[in-house]
Amino acid sequence: HFNHCVAVVKLSDGTMMPLDPTWVPFCRELWSSAEQQQNYLPGTPEGTDLCITPISAPENHYVRIQANNVLDDKGTLKGSFTIEAEGQSDSNIRRIFTTGFQSEWKNALERQLLNVSPKARLEGVDYGRSPKDYQRAPIRMTFRYEIPDYALKSDQGVLIFKPFVLNNL
């Protein structure tokens, strides 16, 4: 098993907190929670026992989606949704901004909407002033869109559709 160097900080309560600059670029965490429950041995002058990296609770990695949509009688869905995320969820969503060219941001976001429907049209997206600035705050984006034929009308006149969040978004 390859291991690399990390820094360890001793907190005021005596616990050790590992810091790993190689795993957390563009991540809001000081220690990547993708590296949970791993053993490590801090090199301190007084010596220490084998430690284990902490578990990060799910609420530290939330994804929240709030939608405001209107489905017309022709089956066209119009509206917006705001997505907010923190922790590893933030890192995964923010990757569009931190690893891609700025000229491709809109196309990358539109591809996410096209996962819902190939007929989707991204009318606009607000990702704030500096979505690359992962240290400022959790990621928050608002999409505005229209999806023609999102719902199909049955012979009885009932609109049938698959819930938006079940469409790989």
Name the predicted role of every residue range.
Residues 1-169:
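A sensor for short, sequence-defined functional sites
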